[in-house]
Amino acid sequence: MIEMRKSGDRGTANYGWLETYHSFSFGKYYDPDNVQFGPLRVLNEDFIKGGKGFDTHPHQNMEIVTYVLSGTLEHKDSTGGEGLIKAGELQRMSAGSGISHSEKNASETEDVHLMQIWFVPEKEGIEPGYEQKEVSKGSDFFNSVITKGGGENKMDINQDITVYVGDLSSGDSGSIEISEGRLGYLHNSMIGTIQVNDLKLEPGDGLKITGPETLAITAESDSRLILFDMAP
């Protein structure tokens, strides 16, 4: 089963320095039909103005993935981790027993466009952790970048999830399966337009998927996608 989540149906807010879109209930936005999907709790698409960002704030017992689509994000946390997350890079942070961090646009003039995703963890109270990875446009249609247990060129995560990203050029096509007993969520970032089976996804559209389903995807323009294959 596939259910469309239209970009225009998302929650949105504009604070001047931050323009944000919420696929699931977040902050002042509440949608009883979109509180959570499997372990996927938050999927925000953010545009942060130059020199601005989120001051130091705490998290606990949440797996947080940040995917920077354009610009550069500066990260600092209470474990001593700090660095720059550049366009095309992902960061995975396990909040576990507790972590505080800040995220700010590293540029004074250029906006940062990013997706931030929160997953409910499999185990609570673990030691906080942090990983970062550059995603190169390889031969695979989708790159598997995060999975439980990690692996070669993959980051670990405290949940039964695999995260795929697709950096597609116009005309690229391929397919991917969500198996029976699994859930999937595909988000088409606010960059390009894609076709998935008989559905046209405009920028910001998403799909809730209950397996088994095969997704045949064609990029109608240059596009950036993220897909989660999850336990229910």
For the regions a language model picked out, list residue spans one by one.
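A short glycine-rich, His/Asp/Glu-containing loop-to-beta-strand
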Residues: 14-58, 63, 114, 121, ...
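Tight coil/turn sites that cap or link beta-strands
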Residues: 45, 50-51, 88, 96, ...
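Histidine-centered metal-chelating micro-motifs
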Residues: 53-55, 72-75, 91-92, 96-104, ...
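Generic beta-strand structural signal
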Residues: 63, 83, 89, 99-101, ...
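Ligand-binding loop in jelly-roll beta-barrel domains
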Residues: 95-125, 210-232
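A short secondary-structure junction signal
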Residues: 102-104, 125-133, 154-158, 176-178
